[in-house]
């Protein structure tokens, strides 16, 4: 059911010395409306205390799969989730890297315009990710992409590709937990250091 619940308070986090709070909203799930309201209220209070806010903006609904295509990581649908996330005052948004586009048209999720697909983006991975960035007030709210699950030997390559796409699209980072922490210490550290190298490399610029 993806029924995320609040199991602590912002004030408790503040009292323990935390400088930020995070939450997850599963947009499209049965509980998403409640999650949006609760997270919005929590983030409002966090900002009153001077804390930063991070939101995991994930899509969860069986209706997002149609005719054999999974639109849970579509650029337009994830972009809309990002927009709602920043509207309720997330300072950083975490989102899956787009794998396709056209979710609005395929499932009739809401109103859209054909120019979104013909003029605002292309099928290039960087352009699809850039559309996610644009939905965060044109990049003023940072986009961090997910590293995804571990696939073994290809993890280092996959992490570098995701980091390069995110950085060149105007994103601000990559979270790569499972790819790093499900490995021996040496391999996990190497993967994280390689991701850092991408963001520290001045020759990798916004496309």
Go through the PLM ranges and name each one.
Residues 1-144, 156-172, 197-200:
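Alpha/beta enzyme core
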Residues 143-149, 176-179:
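Glycine-rich beta-strand-to-loop/alpha-helix junction loops that act as flexible
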């Amino acid at each position: 059911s993806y029924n995320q619940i609040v199991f602590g308070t912002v004030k408790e986090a503040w009292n323990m010395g935390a400088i930020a709070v995070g939450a997850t909203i599963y947009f499209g799930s049965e509980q998403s409306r409640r999650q949006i309201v609760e997270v919005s209220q929590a983030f409002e209070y966090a900002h009153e205390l001077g804390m930063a806010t991070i939101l995991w903006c994930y899509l969860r609904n069986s209706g997002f799969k149609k005719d054999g295509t999974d639109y849970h990581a579509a650029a337009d649908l994830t972009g809309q989730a990002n927009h709602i996330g920043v509207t309720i005052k997330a300072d950083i948004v975490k989102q899956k890297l787009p794998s396709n586009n056209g979710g609005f048209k395929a499932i009739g999720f809401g109103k859209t315009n054909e120019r979104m697909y013909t003029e605002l983006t292309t099928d290039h991975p960087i352009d699809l990710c850039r559309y996610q960035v644009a939905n965060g007030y044109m990049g003023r709210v940072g986009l961090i992409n997910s590293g995804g699950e571990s696939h073994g030997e290809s993890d280092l390559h996959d992490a570098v590709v995701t980091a390069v796409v995110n950085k060149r699209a105007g994103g601000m980072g990559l979270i790569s937990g499972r790819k790093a922490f499900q490995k021996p210490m040496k391999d996990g550290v190497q993967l994280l250091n390689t991701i850092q190298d991408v963001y520290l490399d001045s020759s990798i610029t916004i496309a």
